[in-house]
């Protein structure tokens, strides 16, 4: 997967197109990510030990990783991700600026 937890991304397609946020959780096996403030759904929950009140909870749902693009750290624009080997380690780079994405 070209994105990781903590990456700043922009949604490029779907109902939340144009929104930006940080990846909270990545699910590599399903190729899905949860982005902060994107794809908000309402979940109806029964009263339980943790939530004695129950009711309707709003939370982020996963979206497919192909619907997000990482933001270039230099320009702040959406960019594709490239890979390069530096000192025997595989690192991610932004295609637009050539900037390193991995610290």
From Swiss-Prot:
Protein name: Large ribosomal subunit protein uL24
UniProt superkingdom: Bacteria
UniProt keyword Ribonucleoprotein, yes or no: yes
An example Gene Ontology CC term for this record: ribonucleoprotein complex
Gene Ontology BP terms: translation
PANTHER family, A to Z: MITOCHONDRIAL RIBOSOMAL PROTEIN L24
Gene3D superfamilies per record: 2.30.30.30
HAMAP family in the cross-refs: Ribosomal_uL24_B
Record keywords, A-Z: Ribonucleoprotein, Ribosomal protein, RNA-binding, rRNA-binding
Family stated for the protein in its record: Belongs to the universal ribosomal protein uL24 family.
Species per Swiss-Prot/TrEMBL record: Bacillus anthracis
Binding partners and assembly: Part of the 50S ribosomal subunit.
InterPro entries per UniProt: KOW (IPR005824), Rib_uL2_dom2 (IPR014722), Ribosomal_uL24 (IPR003256), Ribosomal_uL24_CS (IPR005825), Ribosomal_uL24_KOW (IPR041988), Translation_prot_SH3-like_sf (IPR008991)
GO molecular function: rRNA binding; structural constituent of ribosome
Functional description taken from the UniProt entry: One of two assembly initiator proteins, it binds directly to the 5'-end of the 23S rRNA, where it nucleates assembly of the 50S subunit. One of the proteins that surrounds the polypeptide exit tunnel on the outside of the subunit.
CDD domains for the chain: KOW_RPL26
Gene this chain is encoded by: rplX
């Amino acid at each position: 997967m070209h994105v990781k937890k903590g990456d700043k991304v922009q949604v490029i397609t779907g109902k939340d197109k144009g929104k930006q946020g940080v990846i909270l959780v990545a699910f590599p096996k399903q190729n899905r990510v949860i982005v902060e403030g994107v794809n908000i759904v309402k979940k109806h929950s029964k009263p339980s030990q943790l939530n004695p009140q129950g009711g309707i909870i709003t939370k982020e749902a996963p979206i497919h990783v192909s619907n997000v693009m990482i933001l270039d750290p230099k320009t702040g624009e959406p960019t594709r991700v490239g890979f390069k080997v530096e000192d025997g380690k595989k690192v991610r780079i932004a295609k637009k600026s050539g900037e390193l994405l991995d610290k």
